[in-house]
UniProtKB/Swiss-Prot annotation:
SMART domains: RuBisCO_small (SM00961)
Protein name in UniProt: Ribulose bisphosphate carboxylase small subunit
Gene: cbbS
Described purpose of this protein according to its UniProt entry: RuBisCO catalyzes two reactions: the carboxylation of D-ribulose 1,5-bisphosphate, the primary event in carbon dioxide fixation, as well as the oxidative fragmentation of the pentose substrate in the photorespiration process. Both reactions occur simultaneously and in competition at the same active site. Although the small subunit is not catalytic it is essential for maximal activity.
GO cellular component annotations of the record: carboxysome
Signal sequence interval, chain numbering: none
First-listed, main subcellular location of the protein, grouped into a coarse class: other
Keyword flag Aminoacyl-tRNA synthetase: no
Self-association and partners: Heterohexadecamer of 8 large and 8 small subunits.
Amino acid sequence: MKTLPKERRYETLSYLPPLSDQQIARQIEYMVREGYIPAVEFNEDSDATTCYWTMWKLPLFHATSTQEVLGEVRECRTEYPNCYIRVVGFDNIKQCQSVSFIVHKPNRY
């Protein structure tokens, strides 16, 4: 019997091919348009039991454009190329994380 190769799956959109910068920008544009507060997080491990990731700087409370958030993603990629990097969107009305997706995976995977 032939089985599928084991691949690591992560959060939202993980069953799709890696997102291009343009697709990441569209996801971030949606977050900003909906009023979510974007933040960039990174971690060396992507294990599903890892609940706490390190936050890159502070959340972007006053972000009004996609380029502000993408700039922080680029800086984080440069500083931590061997880490997983994700963008999260916090809903300040519901007081919870509403959106989360990985924007960078290390070359080892």
